[in-house]
Amino acid sequence: MARMSTNSTTPLSHIRNFSIVAHIDHGKSTLADRLIQTTGGLAEREMSEQVLDNMDIERERGITIKAQTVRLHYQANNGEKYILNLIDTPGHVDFAYEVSRSLSACEGSLLVVDASQGVEAQTLANVYQAIDNNHELVTVLNKIDLPAAEPDRIKEQIEEVIGIDASEAVLISAKTGLGIPDVLEAIVNRLPAPKSPGGDKAPLKALLVDSWYDTYLGVMVLVRIIDGVLTKGQTIRMMGTDAKYQVERVGVLTPKMVNVDSLGPGEIGFITASIKEVADTRVGDTITEDKRPTAQALPGFKPAQPVVFCGLFPVDAADFEDLRAAMGKLRLNDASFSFEMESSAALGFGFRCGFLGLLHLEIIQERLEREFDLDLIATAPSVVYKMFMTDGSERELHNPADMPDVVKISEIHEPWIRATILTPDDYLGGILKLCQDRRGIQIELTYVGTRAMLTYDLPLNEVVFDFYDRLKSISKGYASFDYTLTDHREGNLVKMSILVNGEPVDALSMMVHRTAAEKRGRDMCEKLKELIPKHMFKIPIQAAIGGNVIARETISALRKDVTAKCYGGDATRKRKLLDKQKAGKKRMRQFGKVEIPQEAFIAALKMGDE
C-alpha cells in the first residue's frame, strides 16, 4: 500500500465532492474510468474497463451494485490544484439506498444521459433524489459519437421531463475520451465546494457513507468529514450504536488504497479500526470523537428494509453448511441482505432471505452459485404482508406457509408501490393492459415527444413475480421501469396451497388475490402435470384455498399389462388379475410417496414464462 503524506489543510474551496447519476447502461462507469485516466489516478497498465466495478458480476451485467469511491487530483485551467472525490453510485432501483447515502456525502452530481436514448425511468428517480439533497447538477450527454445521437432533441427532453436547464450540457463520448477535459472543468467551475459549519477546530463529525469487508484489513469504513479532523490513533464513537473503536489506519482511495495522516473537513476517505462485522457499522451513522463528541448527530438515515422474501435451499442437502458460510460472507459486505434458517418438508433445510428487490435477489443468488459454487433452488418470491388479527394484535407474514388459520385474521394488508414507466407510445396499449391485469390503478399519463410516461399504483405482490420480464417483452426491451414503496392497503388475499397426491407442498404455497387465484392455480397444476413423472398409481394435483379445491389435474398411472400371460379367452381369469392389480394400486396410492423432481420445483417457480 502506497504511503502518501498529505497535509490536511486542503482548503475547502479546492475540494469538490460529486456523484454520477444515470440510468443503467448510459455509460456512467466508463465516464468514471476516463476521469481516473485523465487525472492520472492509475497508470495506463493498471487501467481495466470499469475500474470501479470490482465484482465480476458487475462487469458482466454492466451494472454497478456497490457504491465505490475515488479521489482524483486535478490541475484546472486556471492553474489551481483541486481534489475531486467521485462517488460512483448504482443506478438500479433495488440499490436506491446505496444511491441515497452516496448522494448525501456530495454537493453536486453529474447527470449522465445517453444522447441516443434520452431520459429513462431510473434517471428520473435518481435525479429527484439528487435534487432532494440540494445538489447542483451538471448535465452530460454521453455517446455523442454514435450515429443515432440527437443531442439537441435530448436537451429539450431533459428540460421538458426533469425541468432543469440543459442548454450548457457537456457533450462527450466516454468511450473515445472526447470532451472529458470539459467535464473536469465543469466540475470545478459549476459544482459547489463542501461546507463545514464548524471548520477543522470543531469536534469531529463525520458521515459513515459505506462499509465493506477486506480479507486482510477487516471492515473498512468510508467516511465523509463534516467538521473536525480524523487522525490515526483517535478513539471514535458511532453515535447510532454507541460502539467505540480505535482508528488504526486512515487513507484515501485513488482507487488504490493510499495511507494519509489525517482527513479534514470536506474530505472523503477510509478508516480501519478492528471492527469485526459490517453489520456493526450502520450506514448513515455519525462518527465522532469519544473524548470530545459533537453536540448532535447528522439527520438520521433509515436502515434498509427488506422488501422481497424468498427461501433459498441447496439442491444437495450436504451443501447446507457451505450455504450458511457463504451467506455469512455475503452479509459481511451487504448489510441490506438478511437471512434466517427455515426447513421445508419438500426441500429440506435452507434459509428464508430478505432482499431489497428482485434484482438484488437475482444477484445474491447468482453470487452464491458463482463465487461459492453452490446449486440452489429459490422458492417463489413473496412480500411482507401485515395481518390484523381478531384479537386486536398485528403480525407480519414473510412466508405464505406460516399463515395462521383464516378465522383468526380480520384483515390482510399488502404493500403497494408507485411505479413510473417510460415507453415508446407504440407499446402503450400492451403496457396499459398489463398494469390493468395486475390490479394497477392509473394515476397519470403524460406524453414527452413520442414517449409516454405512465404513473401507476400497483400491489408489490403482482410485481415481484414476473412483471419486469413481461414489461420488457411487451415493449421489446424499450420500456424502463422504476418504483418506490408507498403504503400498505387492505386486499382480498388468500393463501393458495398446492397438493400432490393429497399432501400439501409447502414450498409451492403462495399468497394470491382471490380474483386471480383460479387462473394461477390452473396454470400451476398444468405445469406440474407436465413435470412430475408418472408413477404406478394415479396422482391428483390440486390447487386449494382452505378446504376448497379450485383446480385439479390428474397424472395417469403407468400400467403393466398383467393379462399378457393369459393365452386363452377366459374372461374371469383376466378380470381376477385386473382386480388384483387395481387393489394393489389403491393400496399404493394410500401409502406411495410421490417423488417431485427438483426440475419440477424450479420450473413451477418460474411461472413467468406464460
Curated annotation (Swiss-Prot):
One of its GO terms (cellular component) is plasma membrane. Keywords: Cell inner membrane, Cell membrane, GTP-binding, Hydrolase, Membrane, Nucleotide-binding, Protein biosynthesis. GO terms for biological process: positive regulation of translation. The keyword Disulfide bond does not apply. It is found in: Cell inner membrane. It holds the Pfam family GTP_EFTU. It catalyses: GTP + H2O = GDP + phosphate + H(+). Residues 13-195 form the tr-type G domain. It is a peripheral membrane protein. One of its GO terms (molecular function) is GTP binding. Belongs to the TRAFAC class translation factor GTPase superfamily. Classic translation factor GTPase family. LepA subfamily. This is Elongation factor 4. It comes from Rhizobium leguminosarum bv. trifolii (strain WSM2304).
